[in-house]
């Protein structure tokens, strides 16, 4: 098995907010990054993967690591902003690979491009490609979201320069709008071993590989990742809502109060927001899980209330009235049980 260190360059420009890839370009790209991470780490237990974002100033989110959970956490912390600096991203990824711990590892860059290619000179790309080829650095370029023939031509030349006479090792993958990014990668050389086999089993189902993994092989991890992702999206939505005006907050409070006043059985799920649906489900769960012994507790409370109060002056009266005291003792459940036992013995 080939030992390889891979740096993944993520495009997190403002263009990643577009919804031509469901649910957005960024979230679709994050799922694809998880998929590539899974493939690389499963191909060889000694493989290492790193992640960097390219918006404005390039930022290395995770240096080369074998910890899958850490890489996924860093991946899903990426936010869209600014413009992408692809040239700087490639250079820094190359530099990070040169400082890999295992010098026997092959070096590879996986570059995601989903933004328009602006101010990128062909000569500069070719120069970088020649330097990477000299140092035996491979590169897979995944282009999605923007149908620019000029951009495709530039990076096609970039990949051809990297491959040289051998004609293999690096690849250019163009994913059309409206298709699944993860499904396209599953069918490409990015997620296949040297023998052409997929890095892990499972079909190209977009749902199964939404987090870059085969759900059947590791359902617990898949569920944990989905829950974590939904919690993060809910947190971001709550933070965005909190930044709204006071009027919006007041309106939400009125809606919540009105929802609380309506009986649970009469709630219209279609008319509620996601937050109200969660609150409704919580209230319903609390109602269903109410203690079943509550009526018995109330009955016992009524019995106690019916007994004479023992306190203050009433205590002296009770001690001076042995007949009343005996009556109270006889009424206790334990005393009744003893009487029944005595009758059975007789």
Swiss-Prot record:
Annotated localization: Cytoplasm; Nucleus
Regions of compositional bias (Basic and acidic residues) in chain numbering: 337-346
GO terms classed as biological process: proteasome-mediated ubiquitin-dependent protein catabolic process; spermatogenesis; ubiquitin-dependent protein catabolic process
Primary site of residence: cytoplasm
Observed phenotype of the null mutant: Temperature-dependent increase in lifespan with a modest increase at 20 degrees Celsius and a 30% increase in mean lifespan at 25 degrees Celsius compared to wild-type animals. Reduced fertility with no sperm produced in the spermatheca, accumulation of a sex-determination protein tra-2 in the intestine, no embryos in the uterus, and an increase in the development time to adulthood as evidenced by an expansion of the proximal oocytes at a young adult stage. Reduced ubiquitin-proteasome system function (UBS), particularly in dorsorectal neurons.
Keyword Transport: no
Keyword Nucleus in record: yes
InterPro entries for the chain: PSMD4, UIM_dom, VWF_A, vWFA_dom_sf
Region called Disordered, residue ranges: 290-346
Source species, domain of life: Eukaryota
Domain annotation VWFA: ranges: 5-190
Keywords, in A-Z order: Cytoplasm, Nucleus, Proteasome, Repeat
All copies of domain UIM, residue ranges: 216-235, 273-292
Subunit structure: The 26S proteasome is composed of a core protease, known as the 20S proteasome, capped at one or both ends by the 19S regulatory complex (RC). The RC is composed of at least 18 different subunits in two subcomplexes, the base and the lid, which form the portions proximal and distal to the 20S proteolytic core, respectively.
Family of this protein: Belongs to the proteasome subunit S5A family.
PANTHER family, per the entry: 26S PROTEASOME NON-ATPASE REGULATORY SUBUNIT 4
UniProt-recorded name of the protein: 26S proteasome non-ATPase regulatory subunit 4
Organism: Caenorhabditis elegans
């Amino acid at each position: 098995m080939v030992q390889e260190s891979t740096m993944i360059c993520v495009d997190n420009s403002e263009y990643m907010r577009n919804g031509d890839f469901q649910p957005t370009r960024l979230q679709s790209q994050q799922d694809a990054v998880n998929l590539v991470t899974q493939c690389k780490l499963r191909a060889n237990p000694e493989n290492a993967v790193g992640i960097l974002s390219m918006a404005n100033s390039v930022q290395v989110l995770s240096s080369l690591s074998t910890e899958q959970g850490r890489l996924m956490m860093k991946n899903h912390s990426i936010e869209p902003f600014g413009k992408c600096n692809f040239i700087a991203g490639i250079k820094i990824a190359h530099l990070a690979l040169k400082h890999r711990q295992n010098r026997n590892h092959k070096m590879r860059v996986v570059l995601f491009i989903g933004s328009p290619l602006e101010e990128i000179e062909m000569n500069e790309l070719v120069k970088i490609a020649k330097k990477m080829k000299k140092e035996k650095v491979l590169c897979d370029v995944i282009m999605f979201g923007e149908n620019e023939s000029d951009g495709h031509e530039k990076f096609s030349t970039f990949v051809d320069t990297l491959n040289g006479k051998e004609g293999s090792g690096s690849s250019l993958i163009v994913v059309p709008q409206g298709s699944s990014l993860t499904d396209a990668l599953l069918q490409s050389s990015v997620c296949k071993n040297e023998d052409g086999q997929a890095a892990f089993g499972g079909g190209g189902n977009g749902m199964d590989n939404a987090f870059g993994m085969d759900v059947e092989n590791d359902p617990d991890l898949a569920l944990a990742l989905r829950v974590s992702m939904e919690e993060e999206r809910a947190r971001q939505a709550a933070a965005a809502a909190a930044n709204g005006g006071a009027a919006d907050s007041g309106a939400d409070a009125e809606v919540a109060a009105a929802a609380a006043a309506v009986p649970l059985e009469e709630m219209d799920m279609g008319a509620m927001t996601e937050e109200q649906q969660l609150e409704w489900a919580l209230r319903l769960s609390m109602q269903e899980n109410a203690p079943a012994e509550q009526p018995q507790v109330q009955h016992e409370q009524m019995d106690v209330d019916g007994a004479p109060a023992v306190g203050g002056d009433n205590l002296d009266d009770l001690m001076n009235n042995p007949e009343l005291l005996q009556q109270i003792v006889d009424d206790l459940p334990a005393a009744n049980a003893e009487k029944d036992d005595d009758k059975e013995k007789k």
